[in-house]
Amino acid sequence: MPNSTGKIAQVIGPVVDVAFPINDNLPEINNALTITRKDGSQLVLEVALELGDGVMRTIAMDSTDGLQRGMAVEDTGGPISVPVGKDTLGRVFNVLGDPIDDGEALDLNHRRDSIHRDAPKFEDLNTSSEILETGIKVIDLLEPYLRGGKVGLFGGAGVGKTVLIQELIHNIAEEHGGISVFTGVGERTREGNDLYFEMKESGVMENTAMVFGQMNEPPGARMRVALTGLTIAEYFRDVEGQDVLLFIDNIFRFTQAGSEVSALLGRIPSAVGYQPTLATEMGQLQERITSTKKGSVTSIQAIYVPADDYTDPAPRTTFAHLDATTNLERRLTEQGIYPAVDPLESSSSALTPEIVGEEHYKVATEVQQVLQRYRELQDIISILGMDELSDEEKVIVARARRVQFFLSQNFNVAERFTGQPGSYVPVEETVKGFKQILEGKYDDYPEDAFRSVGRIEEVVEKAKKMGFAP
């Protein structure tokens, strides 16, 4: 049966109502419709609601400027589909899978997959307890990431989520050589542009596909771009049998776009103005990000926390789907500790003796205990000063401060801003360094020698340069 043709009934911003003849074959929900503008360009709409009497309410994937009532609208007969496969590596796409870099157009016969798909069946799932080494000390020691797991980077505005994601892409591509898919959802175009050229310069881009739906795009594009990136990642997992890294920056913007679309469709909002379907939409996305018997998708998602409020429904809904959380804390940036990861609020289901080993688990637990005790003593220190502490407490505070500074390190991707070379620290070296600090081996060394260094040997070198003689 031929696909039906309708006409624009009304345009309200990014929402377009399309009237089809009532006796026609009406398009299904999530089908893509196309409008050919007067200049020959095409606008894609996605069916969101059926209003009755043959009228379908749709969301535009691009600007609706220049549309008029009565313009012809074609049903494509299926959902939005995007190119997948090895030809997507090294390229940058928009929500519709059109290349937006300066490369060649893809072959028209190239394989395309629908962005709306079911999550893998229960019997196809595979659970892994293998650690993914990142080379970032605070992560590898205290909240190790699982291969095939879901990780959330939580933080307010300007605490370093995007820089941390860039460093993870750099380290994992350099050390593990895996395929990465980076999805920019509602973030700054400048950051995406910088990331693209940085990755091209470092040679990482040839194993990476990038998909962008940035801040200036209509809410429909920002809502669907995460699914476009996920569809590209799923192909490498299911068909090529690869282990894929999926970076999403920022998952909050996915929720925010869904909230805008929901309001435009006339749904009654729920708590704090979010869409009533928030948990469903998040579940449909997150359940597709998983490991199967063929391959794995490890996802690292930046999550903006509005006004640093972790009880907000958007970050709270995301929490339920994660294996590990990395919380970025503003007070640590104020102390000049980067990455500003809160070692006590961050967590991982992988931090168990069975997965990381006895020694790693013991050192990580001791680090957390020392930092927790230091946090408890800070009130006494701020009111009465260090003199009121017992000798044992003074030792705990001194070691905790050295541990806290040693959790910081320079990033490779920040080298051009800081002028300091970045460091990649293997897990064994990280565990060894913290074990020696906790044993008191470096109690006499100046605190500043522990700031922004990689391995423990660098502390000794830095202390010597500062004129310290052990």
Curated annotation (Swiss-Prot):
Primary localization: membrane
EC id: 7.1.2.2
A GO cellular-component term linked to this record: plasma membrane
SUPFAM superfamilies: C-terminal domain of alpha and beta subunits of F1 ATP synthase, N-terminal domain of alpha and beta subunits of F1 ATP synthase, P-loop containing nucleoside triphosphate hydrolases
Keywords: ATP synthesis, ATP-binding, Cell membrane, CF(1), Hydrogen ion transport, Ion transport, Membrane, Nucleotide-binding, Translocase, Transport
Topology with respect to the bilayer: Peripheral membrane protein
Residues reported to bind ATP: 155-162
Catalytic activity: ATP + H2O + 4 H(+)(in) = ADP + phosphate + 5 H(+)(out)
Record has Zinc as a keyword: no
MF term (GO), any: ATP hydrolysis activity
Subcellular location field: Cell membrane
InterPro entries assigned to the protein according to its UniProt record, in alphabetical order: AAA+_ATPase, ATP-synt_VA_C, ATP_synth_F1_bsu, ATPase_a/bsu_AS, ATPase_alpha/beta_chains, ATPase_F1/V1/A1_a/bsu_N, ATPase_F1/V1/A1_a/bsu_N_sf, ATPase_F1/V1/A1_a/bsu_nucl-bd
HAMAP family from the UniProt entry: ATP_synth_beta_bact
UniProt record similarity statement: Belongs to the ATPase alpha/beta chains family.
Subunit structure: F-type ATPases have 2 components, CF(1) - the catalytic core - and CF(0) - the membrane proton channel. CF(1) has five subunits: alpha(3), beta(3), gamma(1), delta(1), epsilon(1). CF(0) has three main subunits: a(1), b(2) and c(9-12). The alpha and beta chains form an alternating ring which encloses part of the gamma chain. CF(1) is attached to CF(0) by a central stalk formed by the gamma and epsilon chains, while a peripheral stalk is formed by the delta and b chains.
Cited function: Produces ATP from ADP in the presence of a proton gradient across the membrane. The catalytic sites are hosted primarily by the beta subunits.
Protein name: ATP synthase subunit beta
Species name: Lacticaseibacillus casei (Lactobacillus casei)
High-level lineage: Bacteria, Bacillati, Bacillota, Bacilli, Lactobacillales
